[in-house]
């Protein structure tokens, strides 16, 4: 009898170990890749990746333990068994559905692109714009901040338009790895930045840099495609034939939650804006040239309207549009100094350029370069050697 009692107790312990282990595992599986207290400030990506990609093995082990002790525990502690089974199921559901990134933020079910005459987006709204050949397209940040990624084809080129509202990072990529087309899904975040998982290897890719940070492809990057951020009104002034991504009616309520995001009035502590300079959530404009990064204070750019500088040995010019939300960055030609803003034109002496960098005269064009508006904490984290323009 003593042996049977001890054996019965041991089997019951298997159930408790399995149930509690499964609950804790599901909690940790979410904790490291979602914005939980402390989770996004730790260097835990390798552990998070291991747990996530070992989830089938861990779940099988814990479920096996539960199965071994289920009947003995059911006979003597039925309500405890029911509660733990319910909590285990709830933890599994929350981890895989309720708190899974790709079940919280969906890609559009329908993708409508409208010309200016049929557009429903306000002229004051911020967009991420791309051009390929003669075709221009604009993607309102209010919309892509919810979706996190929108796949589109612009003049035959497949592009992945991405945005992370917690870092305020807009990037456009060609969804390919080593020249082969790839499919990505939103999987979570690391250091507050969205992460995507590729379909072939399950590697995790950072939205802000396009670099794989975990998995077989760690260290590789997907090609970035040039994009510019400005108000829709400014974009259409430069590209009147552009088509504009329209709201998907299925997600109208989701978009409403981001209605004031453009102006920095986020509804949560994750998306709010610091109005002072160089605080965690202050806006900066970041530039990278020749692998050298530099950040420029948004408040200073608004005040001075233009900043002429050298980054990585490259002379650059950053200017603010008259709407105080559109900004532009150019690589400068030699022998041109004294640039000034004249409405929405650039002038140096008697030469004038539009905000695409074109000039009707014989002067060299101003070559647009990628520049990014984002939170200071994001730029500093993903460009650890960055300089600051003082």
Per-region residue spans from a language model:
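Mid-to-C-terminal functional-domain signal that highlights helix-capping/loop sites
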Residues: 7-390
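Short, Lys/Arg-rich, polar N-terminal cytosolic tail immediately upstream
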Residues: 1-7
């Amino acid at each position: 009898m003593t042996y049977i009692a001890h054996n019965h107790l041991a089997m019951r312990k298997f159930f408790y170990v399995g149930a509690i282990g499964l609950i804790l595992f599901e909690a940790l599986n979410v904790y490291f890749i979602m914005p939980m207290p402390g989770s996004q400030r730790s260097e835990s990506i390798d552990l998070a990746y291991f747990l996530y990609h070992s989830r089938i093995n861990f779940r099988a082990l814990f479920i096996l333990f539960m199965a071994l002790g289920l009947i003995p525990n059911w006979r003597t502690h039925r309500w405890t068994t029911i509660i733990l089974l319910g909590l285990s199921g709830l933890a599994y559901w929350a981890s895989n559905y309720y708190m899974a990134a790709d079940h919280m933020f969906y890609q559009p079910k329908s993708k409508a692109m409208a010309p200016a005459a049929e557009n429903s987006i306000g002229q004051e709204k911020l967009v991420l714009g791309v051009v390929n050949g003669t075709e221009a397209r604009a993607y309102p940040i209010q919309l892509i901040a919810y979706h996190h990624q929108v796949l589109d084809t612009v003049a035959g080129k497949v592009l992945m338009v991405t945005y992370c509202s917690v870092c305020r990072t807009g990037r456009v990529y060609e969804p390919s790895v080593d020249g082969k087309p790839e499919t990505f899904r939103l999987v979570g975040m690391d250091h507050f930045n969205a992460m995507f998982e590729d379909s072939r290897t399950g590697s995790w890719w950072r939205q802000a840099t396009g670099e794989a940070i975990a998995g077989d492809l760690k260290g590789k990057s997907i090609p970035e495609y040039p994009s510019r951020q400005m108000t829709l009104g400014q974009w259409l002034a430069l590209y009147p034939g552009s088509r504009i991504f329209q709201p998907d009616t299925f997600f109208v309520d989701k978009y409403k939650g981001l209605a004031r995001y453009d102006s920095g009035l986020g509804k949560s502590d994750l998306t709010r804006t610091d109005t002072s300079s160089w605080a965690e959530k202050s806006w900066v404009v970041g530039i990278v040239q020749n692998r050298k990064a530099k950040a420029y204070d948004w408040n200073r750019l608004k005040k001075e309207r233009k900043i002429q500088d050298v980054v990585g040995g490259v002379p650059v010019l950053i200017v603010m549009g008259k709407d105080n939300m559109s900004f532009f960055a150019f690589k400068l030609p030699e022998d041109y100094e004294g640039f000034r803003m004249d409405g929405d034109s650039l002038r140096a002496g008697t030469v004038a350029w539009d905000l695409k960098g074109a000039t009707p005269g014989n002067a060299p064009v101003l070559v647009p370069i990628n520049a990014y508006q984002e939170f200071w904490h994001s730029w500093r984290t993903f460009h650890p050697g960055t300089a600051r323009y003082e």
